[in-house]
Amino acid sequence: MVDRKEDQSTQFRDTSSGNFEQAAKTATQTQVDPSLADAQTVAQSLGVDLNTGLSQAEAKRRLDKYGPNELASAPPVPKWKKFLEQFKDPLVYLLLAATGISLVAWFIERANAVPGAEGGEALPFDAIVIVLILIVNAVLGYIQESKAEAAVEALSSMTAPQTNVLRDGKIERINTVDVVPGDIIVLGEGDSVSADGRLFAAASLRIAEASLTGESVPVGKKTDTLAQAKALGDRANMVFNGTSVTQGTGRAIVTSTGMGTQVGKIADLLQATEDDETPLQKEMNYVSKILGSAVCIIAVVVLVALALTEGFQDVHDVIDSLLLAVSLAVAAVPEGLAAILTVVLALGVQRMAMHNAIVKKLHSVETLGSASVICSDKTGTLTRNEMTVERVVTPSGEVQLTGTGYAPEGRMVVDPQTMEHAQIRGIIESEAVATLAVGALANDGELRESAASAGNAETVTWEAVGDPTEVSLIVAARKVKANRKYANYERVGEIPFTSERKRMSIVAQDNADAGRLTVFSKGAPDVLLGYCSRIAVGGAVRPLTEGDRQQILATVEQLSSDAYRTLGQAYRPLGTASLAQVPGIMLNSAGHVADIAEQSDVLENDLIWVGMIGIIDPPRTEVRDSVAEAHRAGIRTVMITGDHPLTAARIATDLGIIDKGGTAMTGSQLDELPDEAAFDKVTSGVSVYARVAPEHKLKIVESLQRQGNIVAMTGDGVNDAPAVKTADIGVAMGITGTEVTKQSAKMILADDNFSTIVAAVREGRGIFDNIRKFLRYLLSSNVGEVFTVFGGVMLAGFLGITPPGSQGVTVPLLATQLLWINLLTDAAPALAMGVDPSTDDVMARKPRKLTDRVIDAEMWGDIIFIGVIMAAVTLIGMDMHLDGGLFTDRSVDAIGHDAQMTEARTMGFTILVFAQMLNALASRSHLQSAFVGLFSNKWLWGAIALSMVLQLAVIYIPFLNTAFGTVPLSVGAWVECLGLAMIVLIASELRKCVLRAR
């Protein structure tokens, strides 16, 4: 037995080394448009005889010339490269620079053997800590984004491993990869189409193209030449790679293989579509650049000022200056931000998963909350992708059937006015049952039932086998128990459906009535009506009048305008148990009845019309409410489908996407637009697109993005993949979605429910709010640290940080202390703010604009204001413990100053930590007081308690004293720290009062 995976991996070899040029050889080889030329012309263009196919020798020559029938794939990105890409961040560059400077300072100091100086450790501790931080962040990012892009490989998996072809006049089964342009492929029910081709023979051929075109039902195929170019879904004389045959047989000339097929073009689009940064990633990069630029400017200002005033006298001055640069870099960069952001987003991913939304890329969690437009495919996304009989129109009236999908659960509902007349109601219901019985008898579909246990309960699922339209008739018949009317019938012959005949019939014998034969027919109402001479009304049969015909045709038109697919139903009792006794029936040479399929003229006439059925792929019941909620949240829903314009407009109207009477714009109309400006004007107002190709979907998404929208694109078919990948956030259906779409998407809906998107939007908006909260909290700490270092250096003489007469630079806080604050004491409260519950108004706000900053000018004002206050109280607290500062004029020697400086640093260190704990309470809202809902987030209080325990540890555990340059503090010193830190909270409350007063 051949292993399937191994077979596929052999079939789809990597042809990327030639950048698709080699694969492009397999583009369409005809010199004419195959859908607009007759089959013989196409055959001549490809040099093939329709009766014998290619010779083996010619097929081999073409395989060598055009290459294998496979899809090109891009070379995988090496793992090491993916890991290194995690370091592509301005803040990381700044920290790497700080690491380099720290190492230079350490090497210089070691080389000059300066004992006792700061940074004179046996190992470059600062550099080691920073590098470890960077590695941890990179590993976290790599783990989250390690899934390789497999979209093209998934596209490849759609192709059938083997194909029947005609070569040297014989049908042979060959590997699909060996199919070449000019081959004659032989198609039968259940086959997958292995290449694009022009049909030249078709018998009752129907092909499922939903994954490629979005068409809900299998498409009837014919060999007629098209009079003009048509959209992909309307090319009835063409077959396409990756689709499948649901009924009938056919033969086609291969016109395109590999990357030249329609699936290949989509694969090429996916290769050409680059992954863009999410809005959140762009914002974080912007913040990184702002911080990096600020610290560089401050460092240059400080170093230039020191050079002009102090000068660099010896190696001590160089080392001190380098350590100052490291301190500034460490102070400016929120080292824990990347890890905190990753954890907060990961927690959001878990919460979304509970709502059946599986997010593949972390940053996409927030992006969905920012979406201003949701572009959705129709089939399988907004609708169930399960054809359903909704209306049955009989000569006496009409009934509606409840229930959707393939579960045979529902009932007949008669018009309320008719309900008052029991006799009329009974007649209509009886006629409806008879109509559905005919539809279920003249049927090749099958409804399969399967049971599955889930805990103590057993769930039943229903599977459609065959044409979905035919299965819908079986489902409808079972809903009204019409199966009882045909339980005794046994099929003895069939006249199959063809696209030319537009009808099908069976001959069945009634075993409960001496085997008497009846013809049951169904088909396009206008066609079937032409073969009817009688009509069944109220339990009696009478001649069909011209008035009856006009009324039936008017009903057909009305149903069609409502996007229903209509099927007429008729029958004819043959009055005998023997076909041979039917007048006009032909016998063969042996005296037996000739093939029934060839005797439609005899059997399909004098039919009795019983009624017609309206079928539709219904909208999902919950989607209308979801569309309305999205609208209230300022989110526009756009339908983009390959289906018929009438169907698209009807579904869109039902769901509230457009108003009643609204229409759909087609792909051909989009092609007529002259330029991007005209295209953008259309997309700014149109909300329904029909009969569109994958290229159109991609252009629509790109146009909406050009207008400043954050676009989410949902879909399930392969035709959706390029647009799904290009959108700011692509959303794939988990159950009905093709593998290629799942791989292209950033999020997958496990329940295929459009409504799940709304829950995900709510979660995304809440996450965005929380990101703003902890960014305000973290960055105010960093700004406070930068101003502490900057102010401490520039005012060192006034504050007593540098004793009178000394030379060189003394940094107020050590880099290791700043790292402790940024990584440990700040991290827990930031994480706690990241899981704050969403506010009630989160879905009442309009989506944020693409130009809106995560940190806007007002928030920067908050951050800088709090940061300056933090720095001021920190430096004041340090000064109070240093002789020769603002609060004391006592002199101190170098040794005494070093001891005081250690205590002062411990004070400043602790004041900053206390100030940040109080700032955590204030940062939960830009306007509301910190005392509103003070205890609503229990995790925040737990985080504050943890941070305080860590601060106690770094001050009172001896080996941490040594590592972080701290000393134990007295009770009085703790009171001082808390009192000074309270000034930060008081200042924040006063600022909020002023803002609220405005």
Language model segments and positions:
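Conserved cytosolic headpiece of P-type ATPases
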Residues: 2-847, 854-855, 868, 909, ...
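Alpha-helical transmembrane segments of multi-pass integral membrane proteins
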Residues: 111, 862-877
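Transmembrane alpha-helix/helix-exit interface in multi-pass inner-membrane proteins
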Residues: 302, 834, 871-883
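Helix-coil boundary and interhelical linker segments in multi-pass alpha-helical membrane proteins
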Residues: 794-814, 880-903
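Generic alpha-helical transmembrane segments
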Residues: 825, 905-920
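Membrane-water interface at loop-to-transmembrane-helix junctions
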Residues: 850-869, 895-907
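A C-terminal functional module that forms or caps the active site or interfaces directly
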Residues: 923
